[in-house]
Structure formats: structure tokens, C-alpha cells
């Protein structure tokens, strides 16, 4: 996991669209060259005094926070309005994160996209135009507040690393997040292939005061590149508690490697990119030490790993972990005679040495493992258990109660009811539950 902060000098000019017909009014009046003329020789005046017409007033521009403000709330962002005209240009100069924004319909207003940085100075310059062509430029300089308390955020995924098709984005927050909706709005996901997913809040959770997970509705498409940006600087995560950094990370999704095991059939199938590649005999947990049912993800792998328990202390080769409590797919050369026939392990999935080595070499963190047929159910948070929940239930974990549509251009929040029907096949998960492996 790593924390990444983005700093630097940014001066971002956000150009407005010129409205068609914005010069449709009459031409500006011109002032006369002189306000009088010399009298004729006869003393009669040939020219009367000409009165100067007033210059048309430009639109009234309002910038919030106002000029000279100190302690501005960064979570409110910047708002610009033009009364009696349209915005032509909004530029924001700051030494912090770049500021982008969007115009309203008709360019009557502009608002920054994300929260502002804490403890940062900003200068906003605005040009607006009236329908008669007159323009006005206004500038406001202000500084955001310095919070008494801040939160930090870490992402589990490593830069440029490859993960399995089940891997969620996992965020760890240093403080209890109560304003989860505001934080969720600040989380952006870009994907090289279209993905529908959702955020889920977990508190308390392993490793942190609060966790947030992004999981696709179905597994990630193999070969997807995922980029995450948390625009958290200036977001108020709890009363008086603000984020103070922007978090970014890019990682990849590798090939699809899915393991499905039945503790009653004593076999596991390995699917690679949707096709059955291996069907191996196994021995799972003996009665009293049953391997727990559930839809897990591989967490890590070790060769060997030291396993210690009642009556044993072993260095076990080719071990792939899928629960925090210590359940693995691993080489069990001592139980090859029982594999395929009887459950004799202390809870792990025993494999023959060659099979364990093959799976070890295939596995990366985030590869799905589904265990079925056991009398013992798995426990939420004993591993990366985000796939324990069906999609309809997982959606309820979103603070916004919305799904996310992600693609190359970023992500948007959408009403789940408007999404296309989920047509993904699910035989890989139902097989284990029905003990048909």
C-alpha cells in the first residue's frame, strides 16, 4: 500500500464557450470628437453642444470565496456567477493542485470540480460579457483554512502491479469517516475497458479506522488498466476533519484465473480466461477444522511458508493464502493418498506437489477462490471478502446509494435502476455451492 501526494504549481485557465449571438445588440455608441464648434463670423452658433452617452455597464460578476477571504472552507470549492451576462473565461492560479471546473448551461455560472487544498492561496480571474458586447474582468484572492485535524488515505494496490480479476480497490482511512457521501464523490476510477461497479464502506475494518472498497459488478475484464484518483485534499470527512492530500495509483488486471473447490467432491477446478484448464484432487479441512465456504480472493503467496499448529511445525512449499486467519492452497506431499477421497487437513486446501506449484506460478493477489460444500461458513473480513455479497446487497454499502460507470474518460455515479441488466454468467460460483466440481 502506498500514500501518494501530488503537489506543484498549477495555473489552470478554464475557457468558456462564447454564446452565439452575444453581439446581436446594437453597436456601441461613439463619443463625438468635440463637445462644441467655433461660432460663425456673424456670431450665430452652427453646432450645439453634444452630450456624451454613458458606457454600457458590464455584467455583475460574483466570486465566492470573496476577495481577501481568510479561512475559506475548501470543501465548498469556488463558485463564479455572472448576472446580466455570460462567463467568457475563468482562470485559477495556485501553488497547489490544479483547479478544474464546469460551466452551467448558458455559461451563467462556473463551479470548481473538486474541493480545494487546505492551507492554500488562490487567485481567481474572471472575464464576463454582456449581450451588447461590453465586458468586465474581476479578480479575487483568498486563502483556505488550516484544519485542526486531518485524515490520511492509503491505497493497497502498488503502482504498475498486476492483480487478479476479483481485486477490489482497497482504501484505508486514518480516521473514522462519517461524511462518507462527500468522500465517495471525490473518488474517481478510470478504466481502459468499460466497467460497472460500486463503492462499499466498511467500519471498523482490518488495518484502519475506516475502509472503502471499489468492486465491479462482475469480475474485471482481463487485461484492464485501472487508474484511481482520490481528490481528497480539502474534503471534510468528519466534522472539522479534512483530507490534506490527493491520492493516485495505476495498476493492471492480468489474466482471469479462477479456482472453484468442492470440499465434498474433493476436487478443485482451475479456469483460465473462462476455460477449464485443470481439475485436481484435493483434501480440505477435516471435521472440526473444516475449510470455510465463501468467495475469497488470493492475498499473497510464499514458498515456503512456516505453518505451526497442534502437533506440527512445517515449512510448506507452494503456498497461496486466501484468508487472514491462515487458510491456503498449498503443497501437501504428506496427504497425496487422501487427496480426491478424504478431508484430512487442518483447514487448508491440500494439493499434490506438481499441482500446487502450477497454481502458485499462476496466482496473483486478487484471483478468485470459491469454496463450497463445507458445513462451516466463512466470515466477513477474514480475507478480502467483498465477493461474499451479491451485487444487490453490495450496492447498499455505497454512501450515495449509486453505482459507478467507469471507462477511459473517468467515472460517473448512476442510479443502479438505469443500468443495463446483468447478463454475466455465474456457473463458476454456483458449481462449488452445488458440489458439482
Q: How should these model regions be labeled?
A:
Residues 105, 141, 282-283, 334:
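Residue-level structural signal for beta-strand termini and adjacent loop
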Residues 93, 190, 271, 321-323:
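A general beta-strand register signal
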Residues 2-255, 405-406, 418, 430:
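Acidic, low-complexity Ser/Thr/Gly/Pro-rich repeat segments typical of extracellular/periplasmic
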Residues 165, 290-293, 302-305, 309-437:
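Exported/periplasmic cell-wall-interacting domains
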Residues 171, 175, 218, 266, ...:
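Solvent-exposed, polar/charged alpha-helical surfaces in well-ordered, non-transmembrane soluble domains
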Residues 170-171, 259-262, 268-270, 278-279, ...:
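Structural recognition of the beta-strand scaffold that forms the well-ordered cores
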Residues 247-286:
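A structural motif detector for short, solvent-exposed N-terminal "entry" segments of globular domains
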Residues 148, 209, 286-295, 341:
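Short, surface-exposed linear segments at secondary-structure transitions and domain or protein termini
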Amino acid at each position: 500500500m502506498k500514500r501518494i501526494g501530488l503537489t506543484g504549481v498549477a495555473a489552470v485557465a478554464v475557457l468558456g464557450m462564447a454564446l452565439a449571438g452575444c453581439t446581436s445588440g446594437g453597436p456601441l455608441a461613439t463619443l463625438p470628437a468635440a463637445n462644441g464648434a467655433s461660432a460663425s463670423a456673424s456670431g450665430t452658433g452652427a453646432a450645439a453642444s453634444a452630450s456624451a452617452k454613458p458606457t454600457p455597464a458590464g455584467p455583475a460578476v460574483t466570486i465566492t470565496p470573496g476577495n481577501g477571504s481568510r479561512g475559506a472552507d475548501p470543501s465548498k470549492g469556488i463558485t463564479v456567477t455572472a448576472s446580466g451576462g455570460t462567463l467568457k473565461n475563468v482562470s485559477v492560479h495556485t501553488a497547489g493542485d490544479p483547479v478544474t471546473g464546469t460551466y452551467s448551461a448558458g455559461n451563467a455560472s462556473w463551479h470548481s470540480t473538486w474541493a480545494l487544498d487546505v492551507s492554500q492561496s488562490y487567485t481567481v480571474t474572471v472575464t464576463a460579457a454582456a449581450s451588447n458586447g461590453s465586458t468586465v474582468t474581476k479578480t479575487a484572492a483568498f486563502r483556505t483554512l488550516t484544519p485542526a485535524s486531518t485524515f490520511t488515505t492509503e491505497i493497497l494496490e502498488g503502482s504498475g502491479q498486476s492483480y487478479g480479476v476479483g481485486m477490489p480497490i482497497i482504501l484505508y482511512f486514518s480516521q473514522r469517516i462519517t461524511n462518507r457521501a462527500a468522500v465517495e464523490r471525490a473518488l474517481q476510477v478510470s478504466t481502459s475497458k468499460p466497467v460497472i461497479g460500486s463503492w462499499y464502506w466498511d467500519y471498523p475494518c482490518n488495518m484502519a479506522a475506516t475502509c472503502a472498497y471499489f468492486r465491479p459488478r462482475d469480475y474485471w475484464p482481463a487485461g484492464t488498466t485501472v487508474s484511481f484518483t482520490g481528490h481528497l485534499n480539502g474534503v471534510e470527512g468528519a466534522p472539522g476533519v479534512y483530507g490534506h492530500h490527493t491520492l493516485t495509483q495505476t495498476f493492471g488486471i492480468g489474466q482471469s484465473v479462477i479456482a472453484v473447490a468442492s470440499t465434498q467432491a474433493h476436487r478443485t477446478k482451475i479456469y483460465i480466461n473462462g476455460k477449464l484448464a485443470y481439475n485436481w484432487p484435493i483434501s480440505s479441512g477435516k471435521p472440526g477444522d473444516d475449510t470455510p465456504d465463501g468467495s475469497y480472493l488470493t492475498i499473497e503467496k510464499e514458498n515456503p511458508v512456516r505453518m505451526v499448529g497442534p502437533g506440527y511445525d512445517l515449512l510448506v512449499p507452494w503456498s497461496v493464502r486466501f484468508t487472514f486467519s491462515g487458510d491456503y492452497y498449498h503443497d501437501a506431499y504428506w496427504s497425496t493418498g487422501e487427496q480426491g477421497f478424504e478431508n484430512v487437513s487442518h483447514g487448508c486446501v491440500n494439493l499434490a506437489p506438481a499441482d500446487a506449484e502450477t497454481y502458485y506460478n499462476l496466482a496473483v493477489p486478487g484471483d478468485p477462490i470459491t469454496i463450497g460444500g463445507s458445513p462451516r461458513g466463512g466470515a466477513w473480513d477474514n480475507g478480502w471478502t467483498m465477493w461474499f455479497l451479491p451485487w444487490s446487497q453490495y450496492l447498499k454499502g455505497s454512501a450515495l446509494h449509486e453505482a459507478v460507470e467507469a471507462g477511459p474518460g473517468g467515472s460517473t455515479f448512476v442510479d443502479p435502476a438505469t443500468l443495463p441488466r446483468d447478463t454475466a454468467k455465474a456457473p463458476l460460483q454456483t458449481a462449488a455451492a452445488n458440489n458439482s466440481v
